Regions:
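Short hydrophobic/small-residue motifs within alpha-helical transmembrane segments
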Residues: 49-51, 137-138
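Short hydrophobic/alpha-helical segments at membrane-entry points of transmembrane helices
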Residues: 92-98
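Juxtamembrane intracellular "pre-TM" segments in multi-pass secondary transporters
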Residues: 179-207
Length: 207
């Protein structure tokens, strides 16, 4: 059970972070070649992605209602919008998509981490949470290897987005049955105590 939970969290972060958030980077040369972006607009689109991630992560951190809904929207949204990116043909549309995908990946990252940490702790296997957080790195590596194949086959940016999206869909389909349903992801109903910046904590921050 614990290994299944850790693997499910790992796959979610492969999809939401490694593909949904970071597949954009190896796509930039193809989108520039297709006239969809310039170097300047590519940087702005990437910034929209980071802004979206900040918004999504901040919202997930504060959420006490519809928590599982956010998680599922984050996961399915990352997959759907990666596929939809194949139809985008200009910086404005890509920027909007990247912002929303950023929000989706922020929700997924924070909430899947909360769920896996809680469940693994209950099962006495907290150390397996390290496997969950290997997901983004594995996803980035997978996206990079796919990019090599895509370049070798001289595929278009649109075709590449479809490949990334289909892969994300297949991966999520493999673990969807194990992910939390309504009422299974517990969040405290009250706000946490405010953080007091003690001398020890200050030294930890600066160390």
């Amino acid at each position: 059970m614990a290994l299944r939970i850790a693997l499910s969290g790992f796959v979610v972060l492969v999809v939401a972070m490694g593909i949904g958030r970071f597949a954009f980077t190896p796509q930039v040369p193809l989108m520039i070649a297709a006239g969809q972006l310039t170097l300047t607009s590519a940087g702005l689109v990437a910034a929209m992605n980071y802004l979206g991630y900040l918004v999504g992560a901040w919202d997930a951190m504060r959420a006490h209602r519809f928590v599982e809904t956010r998680l599922w929207l984050g996961i399915t949204g990352a997959v759907a919008l990666t596929l939809l990116s194949a139809a985008a043909d200009n910086a404005v549309v890509h920027g909007l998509l990247r912002f929303v995908i950023g929000c989706m990946s922020g929700w997924s990252m924070v909430l899947i981490a909360a769920w896996t940490n809680e469940r693994l702790g209950q099962l006495g296997k907290p150390g397996l949470s390290a496997a969950v957080f290997a997901g983004p790195g594995a996803g980035i590596a997978l996206s990079g290897l796919l990019a090599v194949y895509i370049q070798a086959k001289s595929l278009s940016a649109g075709a590449a987005w479809q490949i990334y999206g289909v892969l994300a869909l297949v991966l999520i389909a493999l673990v969807a049955r194990y992910l939390p349903r309504s009422g299974q992801l517990h969040r405290p109903g009250s706000a946490p105590e405010p953080l007091v910046l003690t001398a020890d904590l200050t030294r930890l921050v600066w160390s």
